Amino acid sequence: ITAAQVNNGSSDNCSIDTMTLDQTDFTCADVGPNTVTMTVTDVNGNVSTCTSTITVQDNINPTAICQDLTVQLDASGAGSITASQVNNGSFDNCVITTLALDKMNFTCADVGANTVTMTVTDINGNTGTCTSTVTVQDNVAPIALCQDLTVQLDASGAGSITAAQVNNGSSDNCSIDTMTLDQTD
């Protein structure tokens, strides 16, 4: 700021030589009210001072930058991410205090592409958002459990079985889609 911006009609019976401020530059550390002293000096060296309250505001939202991410489900069918994994260099003119995601935990119901929103908040409460595509993958193979089976042949000498008859409690971290046999008759 300049003394001219703070001056509210200073005068002298002769003439004013200089007007100076004890602080002219402000940073994020100065957000809020600041007392600034203006010193007015006339051509004869006489000095007078006054104070003014300068309120510094940070109204600039952080710039949120997201990156896409892939998450693998574990053996229990769960996966999670953190905001720092989604963050791709978000920045602010002051200081970022929090990164938050609207969804961090994923299950088998989320397999595929999911849109996640990250909110970046700065020290003065300003926010910025971005979205990321989080691709959830289930790469855990099912556990196939089989049981022995005795098949009685019919009068024509044929017999058949189903996968359900051979299954002995097979499982998967998500769910079993299909069970097949390589030979059924």
Predicted regions and their residues:
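Proline-threonine-serine-rich low-complexity tracts
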Residues: I1-D185
